[in-house]
């Protein structure tokens, strides 16, 4: 039972020492099976029922759901098990060895966000789970850093409907109730190659893309004018042109040009709406040059997310922390968990440490995080 659990710092150390990198590049991508096994064993030791769920379409990735208590509702504490890859040349410490120095715990995943599971396990030492009046669930997901496949699949397949959920991403213990989404597309134009000495015998894809970009930039301006959410520091949907490539020689008519772009929609904007706006913007080019322009997703889209500001979860957490909820521009798994129940993003560590060399979590977060976890379990599972 509880006395089987290693000390907090040893749990943390074991999590960091177990690599679980997710990457779109197969050579860097790793299974999270070993980490899931670690977590599953610890939660079983605490008396939880544990289910391990293979995630389809991934390279041997798994979700874990640990549950205890009976009845409907309850609380879900969630987080992802994977980390981003690391740049060996920029780290001054071993990313897989937990190192404590000057009030900081260094290691890959200390803040983002394997460490959150160490906080949950440690807090449960002081919770009598036999007295829960509502269930407590712990969800550990796969591939948040790439496709969010774990959270997507869990949300699509589970019958659970907790009263509320908290995702322990690093927010410096400032509660987050909304964020923008993310859509990334490849705009591809197929021209007709030819010698540059006779332009009429070809179709220059770069010139067509130049025309398309003009329409896309007009869409960017329209998004800024039509949609507003003043709580965001950037209070409108953003559109960015991030990458372009076309042609292969100065004396050849360009046969193909490809542009990568993204849109970060506000909460409430649908993918159908956004895709319609993009297709409408590009319609003049498509109509003039039939069959030459295509639009494809680069990554599965992430919707915007918002927890109602007057929900009990928001009121309880704001009261416990003495802090108002915030909105942020980055993305999390919250849109998918929010389909099950009202969800907040709230956890130890700073988002500024996410994806950084020499990632760390400040030890000043240890005590308040532990106390907060105990308090929310008491509030949502004991009453």
Swiss-Prot record:
SUPFAM superfamilies: Bacterial exopeptidase dimerisation domain, Zn-dependent exopeptidases. It comes from the Bacteria. It is an enzyme of class 3 (hydrolase). It catalyses: N(2)-acetyl-L-ornithine + H2O = L-ornithine + acetate. Binds 2 Zn(2+) or Co(2+) ions per subunit. Zn(2+) 1 binds at residues 80, 112, 169. Pfam families: M20_dimer, Peptidase_M20. GO terms for biological process: L-arginine biosynthetic process. Pathway: Amino-acid biosynthesis; L-arginine biosynthesis; L-ornithine from N(2)-acetyl-L-ornithine (linear): step 1/1. GO terms for molecular function: acetylornithine deacetylase activity; zinc ion binding. One of its GO terms (cellular component) is cytoplasm. The keyword rRNA processing does not apply. Zn(2+) 2 binds at residues 112, 145, 355. The active site is at residues 82, 144. Its cofactor is Zn(2+); Co(2+); glutathione. Keywords: Amino-acid biosynthesis, Arginine biosynthesis, Cobalt, Cytoplasm, Hydrolase, Metal-binding, Zinc. Its EC number is 3.5.1.16. It is found in: Cytoplasm. Homodimer. Belongs to the peptidase M20A family. ArgE subfamily. Catalyzes the hydrolysis of the amide bond of N(2)-acetylated L-amino acids. Cleaves the acetyl group from N-acetyl-L-ornithine to form L-ornithine, an intermediate in L-arginine biosynthesis pathway, and a branchpoint in the synthesis of polyamines. This is Acetylornithine deacetylase. It comes from Shigella boydii serotype 18 (strain CDC 3083-94 / BS512).
């Amino acid at each position: 039972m509880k006395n089987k659990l290693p000390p907090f710092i040893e749990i943390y150390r074991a999590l960091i020492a177990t690599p679980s990198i997710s990457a779109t590049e197969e050579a860097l991508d790793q299974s999270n099976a070993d980490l899931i096994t670690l977590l599953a064993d610890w939660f079983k030791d605490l008396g939880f029922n544990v289910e391990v769920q293979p995630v389809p379409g991934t390279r041997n990735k798994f979700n874990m759901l640990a549950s205890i208590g009976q009845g409907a509702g309850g609380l879900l504490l969630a987080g992802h098990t994977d980390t981003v890859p690391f740049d060996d040349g920029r780290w001054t410490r071993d990313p897989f060895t937990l190192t404590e120095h000057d009030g900081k715990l260094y290691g890959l995943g200390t803040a983002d966000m394997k460490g959150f599971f160490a906080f949950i396990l440690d807090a449960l030492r002081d919770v009598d789970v036999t007295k829960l009046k509502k269930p407590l669930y712990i969800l550990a997901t796969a591939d948040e850093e790439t496709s969010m496949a774990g959270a997507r699949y869990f949300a699509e397949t589970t019958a659970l409907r907790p009263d509320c959920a908290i995702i322990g991403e690093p927010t410096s213990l400032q509660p987050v109730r909304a964020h923008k989404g993310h859509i990334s597309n490849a705009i591809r134009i197929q021209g007709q190659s030819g010698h540059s000495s006779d332009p009429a015998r070809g179709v220059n894809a770069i010139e067509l893309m130049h025309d398309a970009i003009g329409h896309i930039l007009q869409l960017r301006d329209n998004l800024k004018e039509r949609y507003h959410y003043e709580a965001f520091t950037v209070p409108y949907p953003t559109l960015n042109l991030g990458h372009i490539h076309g042609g292969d020689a100065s004396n050849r008519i360009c046969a193909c040009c490809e542009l990568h772009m993204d849109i970060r929609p506000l909460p409430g904007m649908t993918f159908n709406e956004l895709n319609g706006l993009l297709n409408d913007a590009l319609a003049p080019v498509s109509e003039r040059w039939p069959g030459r322009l295509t639009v494809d997703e680069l990554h599965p889209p992430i919707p915007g997310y918002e927890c109602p500001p007057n929900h009990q979860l928001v009121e309880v957490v704001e009261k416990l922390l003495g802090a108002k909820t915030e909105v942020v521009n980055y993305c999390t798994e919250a849109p998918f968990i929010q389909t099950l129940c009202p969800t907040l993003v709230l956890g130890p560590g700073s988002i500024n440490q996410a994806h950084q060399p020499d990632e760390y979590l400040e030890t000043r977060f240890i005590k308040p995080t532990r106390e907060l976890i105990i308090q929310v379990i008491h509030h949502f599972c004991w009453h």
